[in-house]
Amino acid sequence: MTKLEVCCYSVDCAITAAQSGADRIELCAGQREGGLTPSYGALRSAREKVAIPVHPIVRPRGGDFCYSTMELAAIKYDIEQIREMGFPGVVVGVLNEEGHIDLPKMREIMAVAQGMAVTFHRAFDMCLNPYVALEQLTDLGVSRILSSGQQQTAENGLRLLRELTQASRGPIIMAGSGVRLTNLHKFQQAGIRELHSSAGQWTSSPMRYRKIGVSMCSETELDEFSQYCVDGDVVAAMKRAVSPDREMQYVS
């Protein structure tokens, strides 16, 4: 059975995704930076309000995945807190200066995350050699790898995703980036059984008064009066599309 993980940037979105049939939530902050560690308040609210599994991302900043000693300490503290709050899994990833999995740092992270399902996020798509990385992450005990097949979209990276799925001795290969209702069948036909999607759209802020000429961000071209929200109808449609009955159509 294909599982659908929905990337959510708020607890409201996580509730919508769960009610619409998602199998799991990746909870993030910082949509415009590709996902950052959610706040304690968001984590606590998610634990109280979302019934399906929630895996928070732990990423202290945007940009690359090569972290300092202090950043690693922050990652470990966050994972410790997330584990103590009862979350079943966590999403994380660390590379070294040469583009390889940072094994010493990842070993420290895995020790702190003991007992949790660890997803190695799309830092995987920035690594030098995905086949070596797959073996290293297998040995580390990582549960799954979120990947676009080292391309801008998972559809473009489908060949590598298929090869990794066939080669994996352990971690589930979960396709993410540009996964949508219109291309789900391509991943199913490739034998990929976990899919990751934001399943949403940009929505306008409810603010009626909008101050002109003042921005809270140095990138003044960004529209601060819009936010990306999960669309429950899209989640429900995607879940129907990956249901067992539909899957039989792709293999028959």
Swiss-Prot record:
Its main location: cytoplasm. The keyword RNA-binding does not apply. The keyword Cytoplasm applies. Keywords: Cytoplasm. GO terms for cellular component: cytoplasm. One of its GO terms (molecular function) is copper ion binding. This is PF03932 family protein CutC. It comes from Pectobacterium carotovorum subsp. carotovorum (strain PC1). The gene is cutC.
